Amino acid sequence: MSINDKPIGFFDSGVGGISVLKEAFKLLPKEDFLYYGDSKNAPYGTKKVEEVKALTFNATDFLMNKGIKALVVACNTATSVTINDLRENYDIPIIGIEPALKPAVELKKGGKIIIMATPMTLAEKKFANLMDLYKETEDIEPLPCPGLPELIEQGIVSGDVIYNYLKDKFSKYDNEKISSIVLGCTHYPFIEKTLKEVTYNKACIIDGSFGTSRELKRQLKNSNMLREENRVGKVTIFNSREDKDIIDLSYKLFNMK
């Protein structure tokens, strides 16, 4: 098999990275994708750094053994902790994801920028460096959201539980003064509709899925690794929990409009 015909690997701590996979599949419809969700060990955002690193390398090895030509780490926490180590150890293009703060700033809407993310993403040096670029000129507030990925892992993406969780998180803010909400965890796009309800659709909601997918395409094109055959690609999903329910949920989220 030529390298062009090999699949692209996607990895996340659970089902969240499927939000990025959806964007990548739209952008690269000829490609085959292998997705590995580590729902057995989700969430990563409250674990110790060394544990996240070990789990990320295990997932990467799983996908490398399937013969992938590139890897997308579709997990903000794993990216912030492990992306440099992965690039040093594997000789394929490796693309990570981080909170899309730059696009929020470039909107130039004024007002407060809220960054929703896991506690670990917000605590890592990579995020601190990102904040340093803008904190002098922008009103940016990190908003840790422990427990939210766990709800989404259960398939709870709407309804009273999600609404009340978000209502409580945003109760301290004046919605009129929020310009943008950056979704700093790949699980969060699945609750975007409820988030808009809670904030009365006042803020621009931004996630990094498209930017990450565009970077994947750019790197594959520059390396002459894009699939050239005129075909429709396929998506195959694996999960460390190894039960039908989580696989069914994964495909449901992939096909969710």
Swiss-Prot record:
It catalyses: L-glutamate = D-glutamate. Pfam families: Asp_Glu_race (PF01177). Coiled coil: none annotated. Gene3D superfamilies: 3.40.50.1860. SUPFAM superfamilies: Aspartate/glutamate racemase. Belongs to the aspartate/glutamate racemases family. The active site is at C75, C185. This is Glutamate racemase. Its EC number is 5.1.1.3. GO terms for molecular function: glutamate racemase activity. Keywords: Cell shape, Cell wall biogenesis/degradation, Isomerase, Peptidoglycan synthesis. GO terms for biological process: cell wall organization; peptidoglycan biosynthetic process; regulation of cell shape. InterPro entries: Asp/Glu/hydantoin_racemase, Asp/Glu_race, Asp/Glu_racemase_AS_1, Asp/Glu_racemase_AS_2, Glu_race. It comes from Clostridium botulinum (strain Okra / Type B1). Substrate binds at D12, S13, Y44, G45, N76, T77, T186, H187. The keyword Isomerase applies.
